[in-house]
A protein has these predicted regions:
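Alpha-helix capping/termination and helix-coil
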Residues: 328, 380, 479-491, 508-521, ...
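Conserved cytosolic headpiece of P-type ATPases
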Residues: 1-454, 459-462, 505, 522-601
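Membrane-water interface at loop-to-transmembrane-helix junctions
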Residues: 454-476, 496-503
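Generic alpha-helical transmembrane segments
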Residues: 432, 437, 477-478, 501-516
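Core segments of transmembrane alpha-helices
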Residues: 400-404, 469-481, 542
Length: 601
């Protein structure tokens, strides 16, 4: 008996519970466009303190559109009128059509490349693309793709004797001295006019790209000194409406959100303001250059105020993850490129984008299939749901275990040798553990979990409130146990001592089942959401039905049923006795309501 008591003190169902919770919630998350690659990722997501998020396609729609073309002197040429400036358009078309990773397919759709490439390809159109592709004079002889370090791409076309460029305006403006006018003639570049125009567009959340050409051969990792600016395009990418709300919910959950983008600072700040990331003057936006000029200690002192990192490099992501982890923060990081893989792998939770590279997906613990910040918020919510469901099971099972151990250990001192038989304790330990996991493992996600502060890394799973609930309800179950067993009042409902001990076995199980309602909510909504967790009531009534069969097995005149009754030391008792034990078991609910009123003030 002592060994059985020790076994009952341990919640063996906890590993099963954790497995069920993870399995059930990860399958639900697929409906929210979240694929969990590593189970620990979703659990950790519920503990995030800081989240570094990409901009394009995650916070913004990722549906880029060229909305304006302007000359190096700052004058805008309406897109429909660009054909009137044939020299400018011809050079611009080559700089785009031969210098992007996108193309038109057989179905006349733009494929390949990133969102920026696709927006530019749509801008020049399929007819222009076909001309550039089919005519030999436009054959590329040398090329270098865009990367986050250079911030430009280039192609050399020897037939034309030129190298064409596409990239960040500042890369050109630091070198160029010449530019085209509207007639395609080379003129002196006016820096004041163009900088004012770029800054104005950037402040309106527009991304600006520059285009140029050189009459020299291509130089690896460099723009030639004789580069001539052709012009600039402004690209718009609006903030997702649902992302704005999701960012607010994540920030209200106590999670700091930092937007990391390759855009220039003014554009990034404008997007961050639209998305609700920057709300007051204390919120900081830094460029990669400014970030790298700061020491780790300086960054740590201001980390709580950082909202934007512009012109960011992949190395900036890895550094920020390391610094935050040194501060004992739980870090989330998004990424989609090969260069993002180290940061995704190093972060506590790496969110790889569904449209990203296989290397990024392999490095991340979670794949966001639709690249949407809203889905990241859902992942955080389900992470917190998993944690809460595990806590619910622990409270449910520990009350049973505490009461079973205490009653079995001290009952002999009160003249009751074996209130719970060995088979009763095994039923409590095995059946209630396993089915309890099913009851509580599928509890629905509640938006109120997003109102809680993130958990600390070193935070104990058993809080003071949780311990108070376990001890209070365990103590009450012990009280009604001894009241039922020792008070003469209850003898009148049973004919024999065997019937009373059988009824006590039923009372113990019913009390545990009613306590299952108590642990569903820390406040008073203990019956809400049952339609979303149909398994709870199914298990509730299945256990009652199984107990009724065990208790009344002796009524069936077959050896197997008599054996079941004898094995569990159970004999049938009357309907009045059933009403009594149901009422006593139900008292677990009002007693816990009183406890909540006292402790939750």
């Amino acid at each position: 008996m002592a060994i059985v008591i020790i076994v009952c003190a341990v919640p063996e169902g906890l590993p099963l519970m954790i497995s069920l919770v993870l399995m059930q919630n990860t399958s639900k998350m697929l409906d929210h466009n979240v694929l969990v690659r590593k189970a620990e990722g979703i659990e950790t997501a519920g503990s995030l303190n800081i989240l570094f998020s990409d901009k394009t396609g995650t916070i913004t729609k990722g549906m880029l559109e060229v909305v304006e073309f302007f000359m190096p002197n700052g004058d805008t040429i309406p897109i429909d009128n660009l054909g009137l400036h044939s020299k400018v358009k011809a050079l611009l078309d080559i700089s785009i059509g031969k210098n992007t990773a996108s193309m038109f397919d057989a179905n006349h759709k733009v494929i390949g490349g990133n969102a920026t490439d696709q927006a530019l390809m749509k801008f020049i159109g399929e007819e222009t693309y076909n001309v550039l592709t089919n005519e030999s004079e436009y054959s590329v002889t040398n090329s270098q793709g865009f990367n986050s370090s250079n911030k430009f791409s280039q192609v050399e076309i020897k037939e034309l004797g030129k190298t064409f460029y596409k990239g960040a305006p500042e890369k050109f403006l630091s070198i160029a001295t010449k530019a085209l006018d509207e007639d395609g003639n080379e003129v002196e570049l006016n820096f004041d006019e163009i900088n004012e125009k770029i800054n104005t567009l950037a402040s309106r959340a527009m991304r600006v790209l520059a285009f140029g050409y050189s009459n020299s051969s291509m130089t690896e990792n460099a723009i030639n000194d004789d580069v001539v600016l052709i012009g600039f395009v402004a690209i718009r990418d609006d903030v997702r409406p649902e992302a704005k709300m999701a960012i607010k919910e994540v920030m209200d959950a106590g999670i700091q959100v930092v937007m990391i983008t390759g855009d220039r600072l003014e554009t990034a700040v404008s997007i961050a303001e639209d998305a609700g990331l920057i709300q007051n003057q204390s919120d900081k936006a830094l460029t990669s250059t400014e970030l790298n000029s700061l020491s780790d200690d300086e960054i740590k002192s201001m980390i709580k105020d950082i909202r934007v990192i512009a012109r960011a490099l992949p190395t900036d992501k890895s550094r920020m993850v390391r610094i935050c982890q040194e501060m004992n923060l739980v870090v989330g990081m998004t990424g989609d490129g090969v260069n993002d893989s180290p940061a995704l792998k190093r972060a506590d939770v790496g969110f790889a984008m569904g449209s990203g590279t296989e290397a990024a997906k392999e490095a991340g613990k979670i794949v966001v299939l639709d690249d949407n910040f809203r889905s990241i918020k859902d992942a955080i919510l389900y992470g917190r749901t998993i944690y809460h469901n595990i806590l619910k099971f622990c409270k449910f099972q520990l009350v049973i275990n505490v009461a079973a151990v205490v009653v079995s250990a001290i009952a002999p001192f009160f003249g009751v040798d074996e209130p719970l038989k060995v088979t009763h304790l095994l039923f409590v330990n095995l059946v209630m553990d396993g089915l309890g996991a099913i009851m509580l493992g599928n509890e629905p996600a509640k938006e109120k979990y997003m109102e809680e502060a993130p958990r600390r890394r070193d935070e104990s799973i058993v809080s003071k409130k949780m311990m108070a609930q376990i001890l209070t309800m365990g103590a009450w179950l012990v009280v009604i146990s001894f009241a039922f067993l020792k008070l003469p009042f209850f003898d009148q409902f049973f004919n024999t001592e065997e019937q009373k001990l059988t009824a006590y076995f039923v009372l113990f199980i019913l009390s545990a089942l009613f306590n299952g309602f108590n642990v569903r909510d820390e406040r008073f909504a203990i019956f809400s959401g049952l339609n979303e967790n149909t398994g709870f009531l199914k298990v509730f009534f299945v256990i009652i039905a199984v107990q009724a069969c065990i208790v009344n097995a002796g009524l069936v005149n077959l050896d197997i049923f008599k054996w079941i009754g004898e094995m569990f030391s159970c004999v049938p008792f009357g309907i009045t006795g059933w009403v009594v034990v149901i009422i006593l078991g139900f008292t677990m609910i009002p007693v816990d309501i009183v406890r909540k009123l006292i402790f939750n003030k």
